[in-house]
C-alpha cells in the first residue's frame, strides 16, 4: 500500500509461488505448502487493503480484528499479477484472486496456460477477459509475428528485457525492439 501511494497508484504487485526448494527451506517454509501460504497471504492483504478493520482465518494464517494503514491509492487495491506457468492449480488461483497473469515468454505452453486460465475463470463465473495478460521476455524481444500473435490471443503487454549493456550496445537493441513492436 505504501509503494502504491508513493508511486501515485502505478504499482503492479507481482507474485509467484517460488520454485527453489532449498531457498524455501532456508526461509523456514514448507515447499509443499507454498501455494496455500501464498493464497492466504494475498487474501489477507486484500482484506487489510480494503477494510478499515479486518480479520482472517485460514489454514496457515489466523488473526482477529486488525488494521493496516495507509490504504492503497489504487482501488480496491493494486493489480495482482501471477507469474509462471499456468497449470490447473495456478490457473485456479489466477482466476480466484489475481488481476492478471504474466508468464515468461517462450518458456511455457502459453496456449495451454491461456486455456487453463479461461477454464478456471469460467468455472467460478468470472469473465476471462477481465484478466490483464502480459508476457515477459527475460532474454531479448520476440519478433513482430510473435508479438502480433500474442495480441490476437488477448495479450495486452509484452515486456522485453534489456541486458545491462553500455549505451552503444543497448540503443541498437532498443531500435530493433521498436521495429518488432
Stretches found by the model and what they are:
Residues 1-181:
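Active-site-adjacent structural elements that line small-molecule/cofactor binding pockets in enzymes
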Amino acid at each position: 500500500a505504501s509503494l502504491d501511494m508513493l508511486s501515485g497508484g502505478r504499482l503492479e504487485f507481482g507474485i509467484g509461488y517460488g520454485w527453489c526448494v532449498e531457498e524455501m527451506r532456508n526461509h523456514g517454509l514448507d515447499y509443499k505448502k507454498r501455494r496455500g501460504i501464498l493464497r492466504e497471504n494475498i487474501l489477507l492483504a486484500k482484506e487489510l487493503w480494503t477494510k478499515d478493520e479486518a480479520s482472517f482465518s485460514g489454514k496457515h494464517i489466523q488473526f482477529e480484528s486488525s488494521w493496516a494503514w495507509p490504504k492503497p491509492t489504487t482501488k480496491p487495491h493494486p493489480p495482482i499479477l501471477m507469474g509462471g506457468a499456468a497449470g490447473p492449480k495456478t490457473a485456479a488461483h489466477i482466476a480466484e484472486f489475481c488481476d492478471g497473469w504474466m508468464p515468461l515468454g517462450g518458456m511455457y505452453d502459453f496456449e495451454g496456460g491461456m486455456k487453463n486460465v479461461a477454464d478456471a475463470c469460467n468455472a467460478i463465473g468470472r469473465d476471462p477477459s477481465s484478466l490483464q495478460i502480459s508476457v515477459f521476455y527475460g532474454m531479448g524481444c520476440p519478433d513482430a509475428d510473435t508479438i502480433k500473435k500474442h495480441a490476437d490471443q488477448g495479450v495486452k503487454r509484452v515486456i522485453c528485457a534489456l541486458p545491462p549493456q553500455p549505451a552503444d550496445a543497448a540503443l541498437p537493441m532498443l531500435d530493433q525492439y521498436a521495429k518488432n513492436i
